[in-house]
Amino acid sequence: MQHKIIHLHQTASTNDYLRALPSPQDDSMTVVYADWQTAGRGQGSNKWESEAGKNLLFSILVCPTSIDITRQFVLSMAGALAVKAALDKYTDGISLKWPTDIYWHDRKISGTLIETSVKGRTLARCIYGIGLNVNQREFHSDAPNPVSLYNIIGVETPTEQLLDEIVQHFDHYYSLAVGGHSDHIVSQYHAALYRREGLHLYEDTSTGEQFSARIDHVSVDGRLHLALSDGTRREYTLKEVRFVLD
């Protein structure tokens, strides 16, 4: 898969930058990364804390026209697996926290904001906005559990090298997704899920109720299916439930 990589010293948001570009006319990806984002964001109204030049702040634009809108979360799975595969080269303990966060043990090293546009029953465009803590040593926001690759391994990692590795893995997993091999992606995603085994504490964000459950599976539309300790089952979409962290 051909890809074009654009480097910016500063931009408001790499997602915004790609959103303004026309869709590629062929089967290719466009990647833009910035040393600094003035308006980088995470899910909802969350802001992404990043020291200038220390981390990877990048977005990927693809046109997955073969993906039905009911199965679009497969693309989220593919993107998460690409980041995990790159990080696995440097450390163990990497897992995927539903829906799109990357964790090292109980600490967040990466997050993804995904934006899609639809044409009929299929996706026209998909933009992955990814923040990955690479060489930042200290964090000062009120985020509860950030960690960087430097915090884990004790040495700095060239950000462009890590980006190239992520793009290579993304090419692999994205090709599986659009090529009709999503079962392979789904099985790998489930095997890598954070808190995949055993009962853990969750909170229903609409009621405030806390309950113990284990992850049963994540469906291709992105719903988290939980099996509760009392034998009942529930399913949640984004922001309807949160993991209660120690």
Please annotate each region the language model reported:
Residues T65-T70, V74-I94, W104-D246:
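Long, positively charged amphipathic alpha-helical accessory segments at protein N-termini or as interdomain linkers
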Residues D26-D27, G53, K97, T122, ...:
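A generic fold-level signal
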Residues M1-K89:
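N-terminal lobe of the biotin/lipoate ligase/transferase fold
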Residues K4-I5, I94-L96:
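Generic structural signal for residues in well-ordered beta-strands
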